[in-house]
Amino acid sequence: MTKEEVLEFPGIVTELLPNATFRVKLENEHEIIAHTAGRMRKNRIRVLAGDKVLVEMTPYDLTKGRITYRFK
């Protein structure tokens, strides 16, 4: 998938789910299920409930996403 096809939205992690997945509430009030990106796992960046994150989504499935950045 090319970079132009990816949609990015900021959101807040509301709930931790099993298997390193999270429920994220986006700024447009939608709730999605997201997992951490590989680079975040590799660098051991922790994501906790209440963290502000950047979520990457594909236009084909707007219910799932990938957490690519955790804001400080």
Curated annotation (Swiss-Prot):
Coiled-coil parts of chain: none
Family: Belongs to the IF-1 family.
Key word RNA-binding present: yes
Subcellular location, record wording: Cytoplasm
Name of this protein: Translation initiation factor IF-1
Subunit details: Component of the 30S ribosomal translation pre-initiation complex which assembles on the 30S ribosome in the order IF-2 and IF-3, IF-1 and N-formylmethionyl-tRNA(fMet); mRNA recruitment can occur at any time during PIC assembly.
GO cellular component: cytosol
Domain of life per record: Bacteria
Function statement: One of the essential components for the initiation of protein synthesis. Stabilizes the binding of IF-2 and IF-3 on the 30S subunit to which N-formylmethionyl-tRNA(fMet) subsequently binds. Helps modulate mRNA selection, yielding the 30S pre-initiation complex (PIC). Upon addition of the 50S ribosomal subunit IF-1, IF-2 and IF-3 are released leaving the mature 70S translation initiation complex.
Pfam families in UniProt: eIF-1a
Keyword Ubl conjugation annotated: no
